[in-house]
Amino acid sequence: MVVSSDQGDSLDVHPINKKPIGERLGYWALNRTYGYENVLPSGPLFRSAEFRDGAVYVSFDYGDGLRSVDGAPLCAFEVAEEEGFYELATAIVEDNCLKVYNTNIKNPRFIRYGWQPFTRANLVNKMGLSASTFRVAASAACVIIDKVSQMQGFPQENENFAKGVSACYAGIAAGKLLIAGGCNFPKIPVHAGGSKKYYRDIYTAELSKDSVLVWQRAGQLPQAMAYGVSVSTADGIICVGGMNEQAALSTTYRIRVANEKAVVETLPSLPCTLDNMTGALLENKLYVAGGNKDGKASNAFYCLDLEQLSQGWQELPAFPGVPRVQPVSAAQLDADGQLCFYLWSGFAAPTEERDASLSVDGYVYSPAANTWTPLPEVMDEVGETVSLSGGVATAWDKNLIICMGGVDKDIFLRALQKTAADYLTHPVEWYRFNKRVLVYDVRLREWQTIACIPDVARAGAALVVCGENIFCINGELKPGVRTPEITCITIKK
């Protein structure tokens, strides 16, 4: 492509000075037709745009050395929340791409550059070749974060629990936010040989429009437990598997709330112990996948029909590839409108038969076809793979899956390989837990980073969705160190 927009005139869009246009045609021909790879063929050509954190991050082909041609601030960029309502925007170079923003526009969804018959647009590359004009809209499937709030209040009657837990069970029951179980190292840190403590108390809190949660102890689980799966249903919260100080568990419980008290019902047990797995509800069927099956990392996949409990848990075809402990999952419609089970990430410690593994790819299970199909690797805004192992995920709208949290793939894999003897002793920042909020579009089969929120950089958090609010509950900031924080992400409808 040869750019001529910078050679126009306010009264005549056709260039009077033809020489620069001819030279640019020559550069293009030398590179593309005659193979002179050392000749830059064009000015910056739009490649992609990431709409996140109140700005648009634009990358270009032939974009090395981005600058203004005249040394003045970059101009002719505009952004808008709604098509047709554009405002001029500031553009600055960051890491060889452009950050474009207007402080009056909180969530830009459209961007354009030099979008007039005559423009004084001044973006060039290192060769001084002008950038092409462009206009781009954010994907219609994009999620817009309205606000991020830190909820105030966490159960205080047990001073050990009050320090925050990891891997608790959580959900919505009778309109209340409920948490149960979980574990932490309340006295001595794990790196100093501290013992992990498991809990069995059940707490509930009313949800209101403010950020204050007033917790009440509503009862107890039949035993202390953590590291299982919990899902909210119209008839209570289902808690599956997990483990405690004594053993891994095969139990399944349903927690209902009536008259401010938790009522726990025992449902059919799994045919094996299962902990550190993932799970999701597809209509009336609860699926769980991966985790440690009878103490070993697995590819296990089971289903319980909540309307036919007498049939118990049914074993389904295992997902392909390596075993996955602490993967993430969500139930969402596929491109054909069929409800499916989506699975990503997970890890497995080394054994005599296989090396340590940390997965960044995924699979989708179709109940209709009873088969697994590969999914794209989790990708961030610059095309790097991301681990969601230990993170959380939830379906959103009709074709999106929101994911957050999880360990850093490189650091954690080295820990699994036992190449870092001092792994447990570093400060929180060293572990680089994932702070991105990522969205997967099942129709486009694409990932998008919509925000970077340090408060969701956790592993072992619980995720609860209520209306437009997503609650990220507790979890660990680094191995062995829990947080009592509950972060609420409000999605703009």
Range-by-range predicted roles:
Residues 64-141, 450:
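C-terminal beta-sandwich/jelly-roll accessory domains of carbohydrate-active enzymes
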Residues 17-35:
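Non-catalytic, well-ordered alpha-helical segments in soluble enzyme domains
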Residues 1-7, 12-22:
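Conserved, well-structured interaction surfaces
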Residues 31-73:
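Surface beta-strand/loop "capping" patches
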Residues 6, 20-23, 39-43, 93:
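Mature catalytic domains of secreted/periplasmic carbohydrate-active enzymes
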Residues 8-12, 65-67, 119-121, 411, ...:
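Flexible loop/turn segments at secondary-structure boundaries
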Residues 55-60, 96-102, 288:
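Generic recognition of long tandem-repeat/solenoid scaffolds
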Residues 142-493:
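Kelch-like beta-propeller repeat domains
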